[in-house]
Amino acid sequence: TRRFDDVLDEVKGFFEVH
């Protein structure tokens, strides 16, 4: 299970890279 913050961090990194 992932934490909401963890998911947000992944999304942030995704948008930062792209």
Curated annotation (Swiss-Prot):
It comes from the Bacteria. Pathway: Metabolic intermediate biosynthesis; chorismate biosynthesis; chorismate from D-erythrose 4-phosphate and phosphoenolpyruvate: step 1/7. The N-terminus is blocked. Its EC number is 2.5.1.54. GO terms for molecular function: 3-deoxy-7-phosphoheptulonate synthase activity. Signal peptide: none annotated. GO terms for biological process: amino acid biosynthetic process; aromatic amino acid family biosynthetic process; chorismate biosynthetic process. Belongs to the class-II DAHP synthase family. This is Phospho-2-dehydro-3-deoxyheptonate aldolase. The gene is aroH.
